[in-house]
């Protein structure tokens, strides 16, 4: 294995050298986390979608004959995620490694790996029957609990795969909240004010408009509780916007 290829196994180096994308330290810490179970409790506009796209592409390219599945809370979010991934691929050398026609729901690479991008739906019908090595949930707290627990989680049983759950918190009676409070998951707390692209003036205006309680959920991501104390917790950095 050449040194150049070994370097590309680092997702941050891959992002910079192949995707022409330089993650901020905020995103780099998450991308380099080797944990198989990761949960990110985040405010709006903190770079969730971009980080998910980078993770999916890097995993697919560096792990032949695997399936990476991105599940979005809505069809519209799924389409936006697909556009983000296709933009990354089409603007880089990776465009030559795509086999067949690029579609919004699935992309196959020359190494036999797939990236599939689908909405959760109300009953998970479009997800059933998929076995995955990597599952990335975008706005997990908005997905039906029965879909997360009965359809998505079982996809990883046969592969002992990786699962990331990223979301703005929406309620305590959800799998996302229980996962956040589980000792088995690596945790990250991403309040919106960490994003340098979001001005303090805007946040103060939002606080006045939507009220303190909603502001704490939407921008401080406090519904899951205070930020955890584990060493993997991100407390700073400069994320890209979604």
Q: Residue locations for each model-derived region?
A:
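Phosphate/NTP-binding elements of NTP-utilizing enzymes
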Residues: 1-242
């Amino acid at each position: 294995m050449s040194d150049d290829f070994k370097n590309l196994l680092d997702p941050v180096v891959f992002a910079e050298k192949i995707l022409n994308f330089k993650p901020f330290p905020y995103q780099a810490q998450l991308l380099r986390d080797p944990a198989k179970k990761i949960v990110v409790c985040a405010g709006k506009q903190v770079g969730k979608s971009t980080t998910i796209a980078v993770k999916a592409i890097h995993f697919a390219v560096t792990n032949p004959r695997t399936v990476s599945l991105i599940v979005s809370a809505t069809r519209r979010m799924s389409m936006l995620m697909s556009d983000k991934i296709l933009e990354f691929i089409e603007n880089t050398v990776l465009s030559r490694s795509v086999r067949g026609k690029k579609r919004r729901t699935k992309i196959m690479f020359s190494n036999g790996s797939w990236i599939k991008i689908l909405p959760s739906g109300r009953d998970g019908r479009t997800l059933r029957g998929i076995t995955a090595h990597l599952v990335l949930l975008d706005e997990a707290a908005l997905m039906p609990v029965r879909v997360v627990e009965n359809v998505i989680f079982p996809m990883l049983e046969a592969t002992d795969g990786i699962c990331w759950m990223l979301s703005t918190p929406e309620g305590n009676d959800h799998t996302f909240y229980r996962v956040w409070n589980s000792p088995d998951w690596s945790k990250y707390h991403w309040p919106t004010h960490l994003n340098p692209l979001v001005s303090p003036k805007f946040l103060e205006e939002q606080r006045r408009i939507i009220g303190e309680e909603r502001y704490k959920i939407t921008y401080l991501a406090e519904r899951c509780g205070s930020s955890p104390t584990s060493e993997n917790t991100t407390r700073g950095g400069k994320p890209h916007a979604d």
